[in-house]
Amino acid sequence: MGLEEKLPSGFLLSTVETLAGYVRKGSLWPATFGLACCAIEMMSTAGPRFDIARFGMERFSATPRQADLMIVAGRVSQKMAPVLRQIYDQMAEPKWVLAMGVCASSGGMFNNYAIVQGVDHVVPVDIYLPGCPPRPEMLLHAILKLHEKIAHMPLGANREEVIRETEAAALAATPTIEMKGLLR
């Protein structure tokens, strides 16, 4: 004998955060930041075979002010890093970042001084998508995982605190060029 049985039909019990998360996850507008071959796979997700529009991403935004998801596809050079950060800063809140491909995630095979060894040293990354290049199906799966994360993201002051902690942790992480083991 739960609460659902005592309420008349037509009532829905939820919180504002849960409802806002449900609405926000279905209306992402991505700002594409295609820098290499991963961008080709990202473009193919908008085609009829994979149809990213069925997940609420009807159009890719050409301006960061109208986007809330940045898909960084490919390697980021040291000269491109300030541009990436500027575009991220121009995006309105709430905003999310998806690092598409191993080059965006960790520098990939370009382990040299000219390439940023992971975009998480420039912007906070919410979802990492491995692969060289990752298939469109993998991008769609990563977007669905991001939908789950968005649905459980707090609002207001709680969200600002989570964002500050996430960004501080990402920028304080050890650069992959300094790591030992399989990465070197």
UniProtKB/Swiss-Prot annotation:
InterPro entries: NADH_UbQ_OxRdtase-like_20kDa (IPR006137), NADH_UQ_OxRdtase_20Kd_su (IPR006138). GO terms for biological process: aerobic respiration; electron transport coupled proton transport. It is found in: Cell membrane. GO terms for cellular component: plasma membrane; respiratory chain complex I. It catalyses: a quinone + NADH + 5 H(+)(in) = a quinol + NAD(+) + 4 H(+)(out). The keyword Repeat does not apply. [4Fe-4S] cluster binds at residues 37-38, 103, 132. Keywords: 4Fe-4S, Cell membrane, Iron, Iron-sulfur, Membrane, Metal-binding, NAD, Quinone, Translocase, Transport. It holds the Pfam family Oxidored_q6. PROSITE patterns: COMPLEX1_20K. Its cofactor is [4Fe-4S] cluster. It is a peripheral membrane protein. Binds 1 [4Fe-4S] cluster. Its EC number is 7.1.1.-. One of its GO terms (molecular function) is iron ion binding. NDH-1 shuttles electrons from NADH, via FMN and iron-sulfur (Fe-S) centers, to quinones in the respiratory chain. The immediate electron acceptor for the enzyme in this species is believed to be a menaquinone. Couples the redox reaction to proton translocation (for every two electrons transferred, four hydrogen ions are translocated across the cytoplasmic membrane), and thus conserves the redox energy in a proton gradient. NDH-1 is composed of 14 different subunits. Subunits NuoB, C, D, E, F, and G constitute the peripheral sector of the complex. Belongs to the complex I 20 kDa subunit family. This is NADH-quinone oxidoreductase subunit B. The lineage of its organism: Bacteria, Bacillati, Actinomycetota, Actinomycetes, Mycobacteriales.
